[in-house]
Amino acid sequence: MERTLAIIKPDAFAAGHAGGILARIYEEGFRVIGMKKLALSEKQAAGFYYVHEGKPFFDDLKGFMSSGPCVVMVLEADGAIRKWRDLMGATNPADAAAGTLRKEFGTSLGRNAVHGSDAPETAAFEVGYFFAGLDLL
């Protein structure tokens, strides 16, 4: 079984889509082994997205991710990283396939509803950023 980090971002949370996104996660056969609702500070958002530091969108990303509550989760499934990325859809909701979370719940490139780890190394860092080993079922 593989693990990946998933985030329901502040835009989707504020719009009341957390329940619909969680329902899809369970429907697709993921096991949620850790979940927290939290509000990130700009410093926490910067630490999480440190790989984007220096890029033109970094300040907007920090501001957005600290703009309201979000839900962070650890998902477990066979091939969890690819499976979650497929369910999320393309980064830009305008380019996302029908039936994906970003197509259904995202509104723009910067407000695309969900986040997911892109590789095993990234998943290990991201899961560890929000969860200690004892936090996971």
Swiss-Prot record:
The active site is at H115. One of its GO terms (biological process) is UTP biosynthetic process. Major role in the synthesis of nucleoside triphosphates other than ATP. The ATP gamma phosphate is transferred to the NDP beta phosphate via a ping-pong mechanism, using a phosphorylated active-site intermediate. It catalyses: a 2'-deoxyribonucleoside 5'-diphosphate + ATP = a 2'-deoxyribonucleoside 5'-triphosphate + ADP; a ribonucleoside 5'-diphosphate + ATP = a ribonucleoside 5'-triphosphate + ADP. Keywords: ATP-binding, Cytoplasm, Kinase, Magnesium, Metal-binding, Nucleotide metabolism, Nucleotide-binding, Phosphoprotein, Transferase. The gene is ndk. SMART domains: NDK. GO terms for molecular function: ATP binding; metal ion binding; nucleoside diphosphate kinase activity. The keyword Transmembrane helix does not apply. One of its GO terms (cellular component) is cytoplasm. It comes from the Bacteria. Homotetramer. Its EC number is 2.7.4.6. Its cofactor is Mg(2+). PANTHER family: NUCLEOSIDE DIPHOSPHATE KINASE, NUCLEOSIDE DIPHOSPHATE KINASE DDB_G0292928-RELATED. Belongs to the NDK family. This is Nucleoside diphosphate kinase. It comes from Syntrophotalea carbinolica (strain DSM 2380 / NBRC 103641 / GraBd1). The keyword Cell cycle does not apply. ATP binds at K9, F57, R85, T91, R102, N112. It is found in: Cytoplasm. Gene3D superfamilies: Nucleoside diphosphate kinase-like domain. SUPFAM superfamilies: Nucleoside diphosphate kinase, NDK. It holds the Pfam family NDK.
